[in-house]
Amino acid sequence: MKVTLPEFERAGVLVVGDVMLDRYWYGPTSRISPEAPVPVVKVENIEERPGGAANVAMNIASLGATSRLVGLTGIDDAARALSQALANVNVKCDFVSVPTHPTITKLRVLSRNQQLIRLDFEEGFSGVDPQPMHERIQQALGSIGALVLSDYAKGALTSVQTMIRLAREAGVPVLIDPKGTDFERYRGATLLTPNLSEFEAVVGKCQDEAQIVERGMKLIAEFELSALLVTRSEQGMTLLQPGRPPLHMPTQAQEVYDVTGAGDTVIGVLAATLASGNTLEEACYFANAAAGVVVGKLGTSTVSPVELENAVRGRAETGFGVMSEEELKQAVAAARKRGEKVVMTNGVFDILHAGHVSYLANARKLGDRLIVAVNSDASTKRLKGETRPVNPLEQRMIVLGALEAVDWVVSFEEDTPQRLIAGILPDLLVKGGDYKPEQIAGSEEVWANGGEVLVLNFEDGCSTTNIIKKIQKDSDK
């Protein structure tokens, strides 16, 4: 099975926030200045890129979505350069011009890929009337699927609560990249996307993932958020939602050259994916993949649909992730040549919970590679009843593929995976629950091939059925 990219061309997103122009001066250094002990850079190339909220808008446009941008600028060369650069990449700008302030500009001088100095030209836009921005938001709400508020604490978002209210009244989700420790101003947002440092500045230093989850859930309740996504650099991302188990996604970055603008890419891909009609879990999956691409580039950058598709499918192409049965057989054959022990399990995994995550982690510890075979939607309906699955096959496989413990995810149409297991013949077949080994589908074939069959315990108190009942009970209140 191939993971399908969102239909970005259907998506419309409005970005509102602090726009800025990033200027880069490049050149070699060969001597020290006689005036002061600093290197002399012979500038040979100048580059100008949209930054801040403008970079978010550019990331959205690069995916093929309709991207609109509202922000504050001066009336100067930097504003004109910013407008032209954005027009060149199909971002529709509707700036509010403030004649008393300069456009925020950041100048970086680089030599041999090393940044020597950064010069900031800004005064902030404090005291500027927010009403023109409110009017622009109101005009756009009927044609967008998501609103992004990109906060760099430069003055464009002094009336965040009004902006959130306007969007929520129109049924438009609000995604916010926060700044500072005053999260009260973001009350009622659909999704906040702080990085770990920003998150810990509000909740305190976290010792482990469990503490991140505990404090994050309290934050969600305190500020009436629909969800919280904590981006954790080399540790990946953690998505928290009320009534759902946490979703931890490992980083997909291969090499990290520059984290500048990575947060802009994450929230841009999140918004474009949600506006395309995908779920939040799917949006996080694609955003995580995009972040892995953009940190491998120098400076503020964007991700194209081709790059995103390659990143999403890269795990399958290199022997990991969601794949077809034939691709899995090839991946297993390659693993065996490397002397790796292959473990296999199966299930519906309809609403992934802590018990599933713990079980899969324990299964993975028993070998070098873990295969998870997943019942198709039709198979699940026959097994669990007409109301199941809650989540369709592609979504279930995407979430499983994002787990660090899982190497390969494959689907099967039959009531049991016996045929699939007979074709793969894992070294170890595991199943959770109170089964006897001889009752497990595929056990005879695995034993006949010299493999092992093992039953693992599930974590007490964790059940998809119980979660569904609780959600139904809460919705009836």
UniProtKB/Swiss-Prot annotation:
Which EC number(s) does UniProt give?
2.7.1.167, 2.7.7.70
What is annotated as the active site? 264
A cellular component term (GO) from this record? cytosol
Instruction: Report whether Disulfide bond shows up as a keyword of the record.
Output: no
Which reaction(s) does its UniProt entry say it catalyses? D-glycero-beta-D-manno-heptose 7-phosphate + ATP = D-glycero-beta-D-manno-heptose 1,7-bisphosphate + ADP + H(+); D-glycero-beta-D-manno-heptose 1-phosphate + ATP + H(+) = ADP-D-glycero-beta-D-manno-heptose + diphosphate
MF terms (GO), sorted A to Z: ATP binding; heptose 7-phosphate kinase activity; heptose-1-phosphate adenylyltransferase activity; phosphotransferase activity, alcohol group as acceptor
Superkingdom, natural source: Bacteria
Some GO term, biological process aspect, for this entry: which one? ADP-L-glycero-beta-D-manno-heptose biosynthetic process
Region called Cytidylyltransferase, residue ranges: 344-477
Q: What does this protein do?
A: Catalyzes the ADP transfer from ATP to D-glycero-beta-D-manno-heptose 1-phosphate, yielding ADP-D-glycero-beta-D-manno-heptose.
How is the quaternary structure described? Homodimer.
Query: HAMAP family annotated for this entry?
Result: HldE
Q: What is this protein called?
A: Bifunctional protein HldE
What species was this sequence derived from? Klebsiella pneumoniae subsp. pneumoniae (strain ATCC 700721 / MGH 78578)
